[in-house]
Regions:
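Glycine-rich phosphate-binding loop plus the immediately following alpha-helix
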Residues: 143, 154-198, 222-233
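Short beta-strand scaffold segments in enzyme catalytic cores
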Residues: 17-23, 125, 139-141, 147-151
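N-terminal beta-alpha supersecondary unit
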Residues: 5-80, 86-90, 119, 123
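Short glycine-rich phosphate-binding loop at a beta-alpha junction
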Residues: 78-88, 267-281, 303-306
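Conserved phosphate-binding catalytic cores of ATP/NTP-utilizing and phosphoryl-transfer enzymes
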Residues: 1-5, 116-138, 320-321
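Glycine-rich phosphate-binding/hydrolytic loop that grips phosphoryl groups
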Residues: 123, 305-344
Length: 357
């Protein structure tokens, strides 16, 4: 029996310091041996958002311990690691540089291959950590830095169907939470506040809802929230605005996902249609429920990665590393960090297409 590859993954693209070790079974299914994520919420809380320099400093302080814990938890010895995969972009350049430099040095020190991973590709392939998915599938990536519809055709083969033309959905959640007085990161709390409010209290705008194909826009919605928040006087009004915001997001995603279904079907002549949702906002239960029902109505299989691999993590980075390792797709140690690194290099450049991070 041949030795199965053991891949160390490292992720420091924003405000999570993460490391993971994965391998695969005899059927080629990935097995997560460890997946350690250290959040920096307390570091950035008083500033109401991520401060790049503080994030990078925190990565530098933690990276060695996080990688050591990932190795310890996996029960794997350093000498048995077959390759090191690190996020090289997109992201905050000062943060990317920490994990990328550490990964290169680690790989060099044990004389093993180094693999540079696109953070978005990690999200795109993350469902394969827990599901036996066949290509192609339609992916909705919704996170703090990215909001995209992608036709995932295979490793390294992606066609962008739509993206945000301004702000990412996760950013819209966090900014709305901040305006309502919710502590950073407030995005996840919006859903809980929404449960206490009336979703019909405010008629909020749905930018480019009837144009732009699969493209998304949230800046106008964010501006409307800003104006209304200045008039709010009671806690119940805050709950009502949170509920109205949540409802509006669901309506936008429902309409745009229907359009994405049509675009995906035009590009792929297949029987089994699969819709995958990944990224931190995929943890929102109301959005999940709405999209699951939409899939049932349109004969799509819906796939949501577990909550622990929806947000930024290193298991998804190691997953891409594993796929590339088997194809001997290695990188040189001078591979640069890329603050902007779209999956679909041929897609039209848009401001929101992976630029903000």
């Amino acid at each position: 029996m041949s030795k199965k590859p053991l891949i160390l993954g490292i992720e420091t693209s924003c405000d999570e310091t993460a490391a993971s070790v994965i391998t695969e079974n005899d059927q080629g299914k990935p097995i997560i041996l460890s997946n350690i994520v250290s959040s920096q919420t307390d570091v950035h809380k008083e500033f109401g958002g991520v401060v790049p320099e503080l994030a990078a400093r925190s990565h530098i302080e933690k990276i060695d311990l996080i990688v050591k814990k990932a190795l310890d938890d996996s029960g794997i010895k350093i000498k048995d690691i077959d390759a090191v995969a690190s996020t090289a972009g997109p992201g905050l350049i000062v943060c990317l540089s920490v994990g990328l430099s550490f990964g290169k040095a680690f790989a060099s020190s044990i004389n093993k291959p180094f693999i540079a991973v696109n953070h978005l590709e990690g999200h795109a392939l993350s469902p394969k950590l827990v599901s036996n998915l066949n290509y192609p599938y339609l992916l909705l990536l919704i996170s703090g830095g990215h909001s995209q519809y992608l036709n995932v055709q295979g490793l390294g083969k992606y066609k962008r169907l739509g993206t945000t033309i301004d702000d990412a959905l996760g950013e819209a959640f966090d900014k709305t939470a901040k305006l309502l007085g919710i502590e950073f990161p407030g995005g996840p709390q919006i859903e809980r506040w929404a449960e206490k409010g009336d979703p019909n209290s405010y008629d909020l705008p749905k930018p480019i809802i009837n144009k732009g194909g699969c493209n998304l826009s949230f800046a106008g919605l964010k501006t409307a929230i800003l104006k209304i928040s200045k008039t709010i006087e009671t806690e119940q009004e805050k709950f009502n605005l949170a509920a109205s915001f949540q409802k509006t997001i669901e309506e936008i995603l429902k309409k745009k996902t229907k359009i994405a279904f049509n675009e995906f079907e035009k590009q792929n002549d297949i029987q089994g249609k699969i819709f995958v949702v990944a990224g931190g906002v995929a943890a929102n239960k109301k959005i999940r429920s709405m999209l699951i029902n939409l899939c049932k109505e349109n004969n799509y299989q819906s796939v949501f990665p577990p909550i622990e691999i929806c947000g930024d993590n290193a298991a998804m980075i190691a997953m891409v590393g594993l796929e590339k390792y088997k194809l001997k797709l290695f990188n040189k140690l001078d591979h640069p960090a890329k603050p902007r690194w779209p999956l679909d290099e041929n897609a039209l450049f848009l401001k929101g297409a992976g630029v903000k991070l």
